[in-house]
Every structure is written in C-alpha cells, then in structure tokens.
C-alpha cells in the first residue's frame, strides 16, 4: 500500500491533468481499499471511516438498487484503517516490526455455532502464503480446547503456537457443516502484528470476514466474536 500511494503521488504531482484508474475483478473490495487509501493519503479525508463511507456512497447507484456497493469485507476496511495510522503516526512508513507469539484464541457466543463448544473447529494460521500453524480441535492436535459454558465461549489454547510478524491470515474450518463463504471457510480474518496493542486482538462479528454478512446472523449472534492473545517472544 505504501509503494502504491508513493507511486500515485508521484504520478499525480507530475501533471495536474493526470488521473489514476484503479480496477480489480469486481471493482468493489480491492479497488475500494486502494481508492480509500489514496483518499486518505491525498488529504481528501482524514480518517478511514469517512473515506470508506464516501467510496460506498459514490459507487452505489441508488437509481438501480439500494444495496451498498462499497468496501464490505472487514479485513479490507481494517487495512484502510492501518493506512490512516501509518500516515498520521508513522509519516507514511511501516511501524516498527513486532514479532508476537500466538498463545490462545477465544470464541465468544459460540452456542449454536457448529457443535457449540469449539470441538469441531480447525484453525489455520498463514503468513506470506505459507501455512505456519494448524490445530485440529477434535483431535486436540496442537491445541487444547476449554469450553467456557458459563460465559458461552470456548478457549483454544495453542500448543507451541507460532511466532508471527507482519500480515497474518487466520482461517477457521468446521467439521460440523458450518456454511462456507469467501475463502471457502466459515470465517477468517487478516491482521498485522505491528498494530496489535496490549497483546490482544478482539474482533466482533461485524469485523470478521463472512460473519459480517446479515444473511449469516441467524447462526452468528450479535455478540459473536474472536479474541486472540499474544505474548512477546
């Protein structure tokens, strides 16, 4: 993203008549992510939320449909927020690298999701397109699962959990037939370790990829969410 905005700044400053054209397969998610990033970089908007709302409003043709046509995937919106931080706090530079050790994952409001206790889940952790860790809860493979029935939650404690740095993708599969969405999994998300504070990341339902969609809300209740807990190596 930083290379992209630097390239666009150079191009746009070369001639006032210059324009940029950004596209992807659908012209919504990935395109919107980069458009919103440029809107922040060029001082047209100060924050990620305003730029995302503006892009969605301009891209939605209300004469044809009221369906929102902006950036919808939460992880894409999250990275627009990361860019806002890089611009305002780090002078358009990457923040200092922050390696973290993943200790455990807590699934909130898990009743009715799969077997309702986390035992059907498989967790995959991917860095730079490489699978760096996998645990199978049913077999207690590389993890132990602790149902917290009183709090409607389940804790997956990773055994020899990975040390990760930079962009991290976390995918959840289910052996209990949970409906699949994008990436052919029930739910997943991306984050970057440099933006983790207090060794904890909490993502509510509307910040998880796939459960953010209203059509899934009969399964994923309003207080569904995922917490990840880290330690410093």
Each model region followed by its residue ranges:
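PTP/DSP superfamily signal
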Residues: 1-21, 26-233
